[in-house]
């Protein structure tokens, strides 16, 4: 009985500390802050900056082709891209660390036509505080991050619901 009391007495604070430390990784510290500008190459070798889209709502998705949740989410992003770019949405995907050949092959095999930017040195993903993929940022017309989605969107409808935050 005394042993159980000691475990409870010392184990509970350790568990609380552990759970609070884990939740720190999921805190949304970037929300309501200005999105960091970047300059990345697209698959054609041309530079693209975030600042060139100032005045437009922007969805940025950090991903990689080897990531199963990214692969599941990609068709939903393509559908949103197809339907929402005519409404003014800018949808950028940022691949982390893969070669253009790998991405081009993946896009061809999956009939995707999204704009891909290459974060080959992982500087932009570090600046955005990416801890895993996929992670998505919704940025309003003033360049302010309004939502950070950690993990894959489960469906197109959920993405569209979140877009209401920045499409006003």
Short names for language-model regions:
Residues 59-60, 91:
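Hydrophobic beta-strand anchors of alpha/beta hydrolase catalytic cores
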Residues 54, 62-79:
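Conserved redox-active cysteine motifs that mediate thiol-disulfide chemistry
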Residues 71-110, 120-127:
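Structural microenvironment flanking redox-active thiols in thiol-disulfide oxidoreductases
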Residues 11-20:
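Bacterial N-terminal signal peptides
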Residues 105-112, 120-166:
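Thiol/disulfide oxidoreductase modules built on the thioredoxin-like
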Residues 22-50:
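N-terminal "domain-start" segment that seeds a small globular fold
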Residues 1-12:
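Bacterial N-terminal signal peptides that target proteins for export
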